Amino acid sequence: MRELGLEIPIEEVYSPNGIALKDAVVHFGGGCTGEVISAEGLVLTNHHCGYGAIQQHSSVEHDYLTEGFWAMNRDAELPTPGLTVTFIDRILDVTSYVTDQLKKDEDPNGTNYLSPSYLSKVAERFAKDENIEVTPATKLELKAFYGGNKYYMFVKTVYSDIRMVGAPPSSIGKFGADTDNWMWPRHTGDFSLFRIYADKNGKPAAYSRDNVPLQVKKHLKISIAGVQEGDFTFVMGFPGRNWRYMISDEVEERLSLIHI
């Protein structure tokens, strides 16, 4: 990345024990990326990522899908039950620990090394053994990489009081999905805005009128300076799916058998 033009220290992109860009990039809902763009928990995401929430709040009297929605003050921001925003606090290399557990535990089918249910149990053990604080808002996710040759545990914090702040009408925000995606060049206002709320101590909490906007560790600043040809760019986020960590045998299987 240095050769391509990265100028900031790599620790400002990701730091396991410090504040970095990763603290401003969130997992929005069940499968989208969001970006924290204010010190008080304002989150920018796609219109199609917020679509379910916009639909949830829409009615005959308030057709936000058609007309759009903008909260003019904090009191007008709409609580959205069921919607969550998740931060990654730490990513830990737990390969040695998992390898030891695999040797100790029974595995009659030989599938433990990739089993989500088994790895979830191992994650709980690791957190207990390493005295990692686990609260009701903590989510532990242990993932196998490179066909089970490496294991990483993601320690996450989940916020559940998320309120809708703004969204353009669908005529502006809807990006067309696969119907339009490969058909013609187009520009759409594919965005929506939400805010993370927490209790007065900044901890995740269920919706309450007493909750306050989250004072975040890090937020992104939107530049209006524009871009120049050759500027360094990179993307951080949560893709719906990818296969970048496939081993060669998996690539061969997809090419010759699955055809994906």
Provide a role label for each language-model segment.
Residues 23-40, 219:
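A conserved glycine-rich beta-strand in the N-terminal activation segment of trypsin-fold
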Residues 90, 110-196:
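Long, charge-dense accessory insertions within large macromolecular proteins
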Residues 258-260:
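Conserved small/polar residues in nucleotide/adenosyl-binding loops
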Residues 53-56, 240-250:
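Short, Lys/Arg- and Gly-enriched loop/turn segments at beta-strand edges
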Residues 48-49, 237-239:
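Short, surface-exposed secondary-structure boundary micro-motifs
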Residues 44-88:
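Catalytic-histidine neighborhood of serine endopeptidases
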Residues 17-20, 198-213:
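Short, basic/aromatic beta-hairpin or loop at an interaction surface
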